[in-house]
């Protein structure tokens, strides 16, 4: 199989970001590098019989409970994510408050559990008081993170309204770049105090008598990176972050705080040594970067890199929590993750059409494998956010007349709407592939879930083999599948298949026949496909 060109940075930095050279990024494009380098094996011919894999699923071997907060999303004042995306006052498709109804409907289909805002890089220069009060009186600013004019017509009150419409918990990231302790404390006061103080009464004056009860708060975004406004080293952030955490929790002790992490122990350890008793999560970001369709296997293998970031974050957090005998350990918040073609769009000044990627079937396979990984790491990953919801590296794109659901929308919908809440261990033996950066990767990537009553099993199976089908032989241990069930597939004519406004259904979810029963059964997984099997057990 062709390994393709090297789509991922090899230099070990968070992201190749040198503003003078015109390269920007949203998050960590690469992280700890895989040291073993090998060449990809030759491809098998398309006419050869299906390869075989064996998969053993035992309902007694549980990995842990899946936190519904892993199905979160993210909206940032970047490109057309907010204006022209979620919020479009001039659109005939908007409701009376300016929210695009078609975007809200699609977000409901994704079962977004919590929604992160206002950034992202944008948060490091955002002053929340600019975005409250009468809209026509709000000051317009020039955003130095993404080089766009910001009208501030979408602010805290509008964000809370949007969250409520899609039944998502709000997750606010405060400004630790140009922001102050007073500003962060006042924001919590505005959102969460019932009244009797200046900012809670200001919220009432603005037409919102009841407190918002915002539970999740992030203490800054990617402040470790030189691309960030107010960039700091770990020691400085650890000291400053502690003070932010103190005043925010003094305003409302019930809130959950997310420390700014990087997935790198050299940053995460000193940060958590300072903030351990104050925070509930530490963040990690991962983006796989590829602008070459030939990088098929290199891209799909890169999910292993995301898993390495998760393990690194969890190792530090769990170790320090155990040493301090913290009753509830600090969890990992993978609050930005996705696949992107390049970062060049970020440096385009005054261009609102940034990062509007037409995702392919290959990208949908990557998203499904990433979700499998997040589910398998459910013991430590308790919050996750796909970046972002609409138009910007997003599963949907708007036009003046409608909404397009891209290929990545469909695995997101399947996992959030049909997964069980308990992750199961899967012992899998699958044929493997290797690339320049990622060795010994299984063609068949699997996650299994059940419910607390162990009445139903779901199997999410990604066949990453481009050249042919894979025949999976399943064993359920002492359990039996009842006849019936449901099966869904996401596939297309080739890995480059994409949805467009002219051809919106090239890649969608299709229901197919599932004829399984007993403790052993077989299922043939089409090449480059996502298959979803669910059945009751006894």
Could you describe each region identified by the protein language model?
Residues 1-13, 31, 36-39:
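N-terminal secretory signal peptides
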Residues 18-29, 40-268, 272-281, 306-307, ...:
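Non-catalytic accessory regions flanking glycosidase/transglycosidase catalytic cores in CAZymes
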Residues 285-301:
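Active-site His/acidic residue clusters
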């Amino acid at each position: 199989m062709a390994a393709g060109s090297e789509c991922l940075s090899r230099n070990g930095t968070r992201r190749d970001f040198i503003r003078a050279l015109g390269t920007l990024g949203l998050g960590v494009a690469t992280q700890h590098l895989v040291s073993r380098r090998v060449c990809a094996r030759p491809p098998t011919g398309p006419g050869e019989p299906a390869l075989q894999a064996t998969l053993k699923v035992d309902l007694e071997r549980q990995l842990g409970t899946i936190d519904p907060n892993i199905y979160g999303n993210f909206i940032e004042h970047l490109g057309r994510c907010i204006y022209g995306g979620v919020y479009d006052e001039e659109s005939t498709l908007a409701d009376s408050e300016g929210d695009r109804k078609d975007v809200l409907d699609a977000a409901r289909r994704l079962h977004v559990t919590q929604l992160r805002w206002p950034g992202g890089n944008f948060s490091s220069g955002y002053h929340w008081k600019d975005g409250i009060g009468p809209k026509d009186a709000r000051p317009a600013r020039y955003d130095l993170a993404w080089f766009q004019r910001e009208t501030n017509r979408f602010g805290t009150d509008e964000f809370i309204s949007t969250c409520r419409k899609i039944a998502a918990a709000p997750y606010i990231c405060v400004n630790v770049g140009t922001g102050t302790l007073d500003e962060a404390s006042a924001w919590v006061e505005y959102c969460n105090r019932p009244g009797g103080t200046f900012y809670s009464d200001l919220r009432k004056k603005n037409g919102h008598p009841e407190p918002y009860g915002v539970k999740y708060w992030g203490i800054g975004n990617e402040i470790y990176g030189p691309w960030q406004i107010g960039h700091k080293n770990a020691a400085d952030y650890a000291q400053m972050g502690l003070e932010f955490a103190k005043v925010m929790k003094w305003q409302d002790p019930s809130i959950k705080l997310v420390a700014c992490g990087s997935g790198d122990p050299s940053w995460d350890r000193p940060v958590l040594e300072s903030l351990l008793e104050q925070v509930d999560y530490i963040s990690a970001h991962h983006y796989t970067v590829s602008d070459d369709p030939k990088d098929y296997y290199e891209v799909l293998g890169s999910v292993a890199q995301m898993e390495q970031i998760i393990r690194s974050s969890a190792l530090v957090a769990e170790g320090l929590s155990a040493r301090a005998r913290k009753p509830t350990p600090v969890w990992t918040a993978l609050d930005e993750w996705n696949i992107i073609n390049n970062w060049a769009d970020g440096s385009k000044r005054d261009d609102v059409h940034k990062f509007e990627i037409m995702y392919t079937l290959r990208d949908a396979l990557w998203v499904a494998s990433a979700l499998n990984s997040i589910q398998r790491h459910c013991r430590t990953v308790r919050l996750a956010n796909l970046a972002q919801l609409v138009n910007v590296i997003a599963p949907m794109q708007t036009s003046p007349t409608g909404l397009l659901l891209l290929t990545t929308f469909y695995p997101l919908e399947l996992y959030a709407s049909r997964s069980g809440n308990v992750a199961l261990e899967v012992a899998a033996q699958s044929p493997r592939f290797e690339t320049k950066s990622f060795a010994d990767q299984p063609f068949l990537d699997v996650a299994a879930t059940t419910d607390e009553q162990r009445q139903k099993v779901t199997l999410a199976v990604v066949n990453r083999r481009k050249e042919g089908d894979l025949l999976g032989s399943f064993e359920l241990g002492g359990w039996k599948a009842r006849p019936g069930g449901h099966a869904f597939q996401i596939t297309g004519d080739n890995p480059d298949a994409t949805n467009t406004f002219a051809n919106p259904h090239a890649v969608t979810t299709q229901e197919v026949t599932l004829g399984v029963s007993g403790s052993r059964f077989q299922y043939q997984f089409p090449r480059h496909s996502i298959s979803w099997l669910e059945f009751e057990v006894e």
